[in-house]
């Protein structure tokens, strides 16, 4: 999916497979656009979700998620949870390290909250 200015949007799944999550994200985006008075916009094929960072399953920690939590906290003062934002940031870091983005390109990581999740998964951090 691309924002109105053409910037790509990449989702990182925390459960399910890529196709399932892409369909869900497309439905939710279409409904959001409808509520904003922008109905009849076809989003099929425009949602890009990666499922490489799900690991052993929903709310199951991964080594890359643990690394992402540590790096975000240490270098940015950013608190991530082990269920959603930790895995999402692990994906974000992986994409950046792989050279997927131009070094001059501005990037945005959308932190969706989840701090209370830290308290439910002390063994994950």
Regions found by a protein language model. Give the residues of each.
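Glycine-rich phosphate/pyrophosphate-binding loop at beta-loop-alpha junctions
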Residues: 1-48, 110-125
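Short, intrinsically disordered/low-complexity patches at protein termini
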Residues: 34, 103-104
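Active-site-adjacent helical/loop segments in soluble small-molecule enzymes
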Residues: 43-103
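Conserved beta-strand elements of the Class I
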Residues: 106-108
């Amino acid at each position: 999916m691309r924002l109105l200015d053409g910037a790509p949007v990449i989702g990182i799944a925390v459960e399910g497979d890529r196709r399932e999550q892409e369909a869900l994200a497309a439905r939710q985006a279409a409904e959001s656009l409808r509520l904003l008075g922008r109905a009849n916009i076809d989003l099929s094929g425009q949602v890009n979700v990666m499922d490489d960072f799900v690991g052993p399953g929903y709310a199951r920690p991964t080594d890359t998620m643990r690394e992402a939590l540590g790096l975000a906290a240490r270098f940015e003062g950013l608190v991530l949870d082990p269920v959603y934002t930790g895995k999402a940031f692990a994906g974000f870091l992986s994409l950046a390290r792989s050279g997927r983005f131009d070094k001059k390109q501005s990037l945005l990581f959308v932190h969706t909250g989840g701090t209370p999740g830290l308290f439910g998964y002390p063994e994950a951090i």
